[in-house]
Amino acid sequence: MSSQKDFDLAIIGGGLAGLIHLHYARKAGLNALVLEGRSGVGGLWRELPAWQDIQICLADWTAGDLPLAGPGQAQILANIQSWVDRFALSDGIRLDSPVSKAKHNGDCWELDIPNGTVRARHLVAAIGGHSKPFIPDVKRPDTQPSSRVRELHSSALRDPAELKGLDVLVVGGGASAFDLLDQSLAHGARHVRWVYRHLRWFTPTTKPKVVAGSFRPYGKMQAHDIPVAQQNALIDADLRARYARFGLDAILPEHSIDMRRDQLIPGRARMLAHFAEIERHQGTVEAIDADSVTLSSGARLTPDVVLWGTGYGTDLRFFDEPKLAAISTLHELASRCGCIFRSLDATDLYFPGVGLDGVGATSWFYAIGARTIMSHIRGTAKLDMEPVHRKLNHLDMIRHLAPRDPGSFTPETGWEFYRDMTLGQADDQPYPLP
């Protein structure tokens, strides 16, 4: 490797993905450094309000015997910190070091941080798909006075108790919106309205998210080699029956579920129990003025607060390469990666987790991918430049990576090993670290 670099690998982001990649870089004998812009590890979880939690079961979030005491924000932060403590990673993490510019100079990556420049031969951008809260553009008068209508993104609602007695308008059709509906109902909002353009599939259930969010049944379908079309048909039939049983036919998504494209979200029990009380509007928010919200249908509403459950975007503007800087969504980013992780727009650049869609084990997924990225850097694996054009869930990822990384996926630890693990592991037990 070039003598002009300081490190074999730099990793932008000290969240779960970044720390796992640091661990596997060290296991591979690479000199690696994590650059984290915040004052501590944890990524986005460090900034989220305490009520935020995961929407998969605990066993699918963590891996090995790394501790996870619960699904909430504080417990998730503690689990992420446990990677630092268990594997003595702290000396490889540079905090308060946001990257303002990333440029490949033809020989290595140069990363500008507040106190200088870090150079590395390879770069992992472990910034996730939740870099920046997304709020759609709406019309506002140029000379608008202060609006009576308060606006909060889901990440900015610090205390849901403040919703008590308020007229609430929730905007969005995915997991963040479902959470906001649930919180509004739980904390006594006077009236709850819901605006959505399109709806994502979710699993109607009375079970908590951390129970309903288990992906193990789906993994077993893969392990039994059930064809994708049949998997989709089985899941679609089950979901439609659940929607009918809960009286939710009015919000059936317009398309049949396709696990190559869709994320499967667990339902929120309180939202389902009070579904009839939620005033629903299909459309978008077009304008917000001094005291009202106008929808694309022409309806004019007067809520006290608008809660934006519109998710997050990807912020890559620190990249010097214009094609990268222009990417703003996880879907765009995934389409610009070959072999799941490898950037098509820059040399020696990797984006972990772009195919992770909530139907898989989070830490395990990152660990499997990190191991192969390190093998590629060391020259024992080959990440090709062919985009996948679909989500790769769990065992699909093993099928894709195994022939490209024979050193990690040996005859003893290849497809059959992970198939047997999927079928044999107790549902409440995390998968072992690879």
Please name every model-derived segment:
Residues 394-414:
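Glycine-rich phosphate/pyrophosphate-binding loop and the adjoining helix
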Residues 2-44, 68-200, 206, 219-383, ...:
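Flavin (primarily FAD) cofactor-binding/catalytic cores of flavoenzymes
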Residues 39-63, 202-218:
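Conserved N-terminal glycine-rich FAD pyrophosphate-binding loop of Rossmann-like flavoproteins
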Residues 382-392:
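Polar, surface-exposed loop/tail segments
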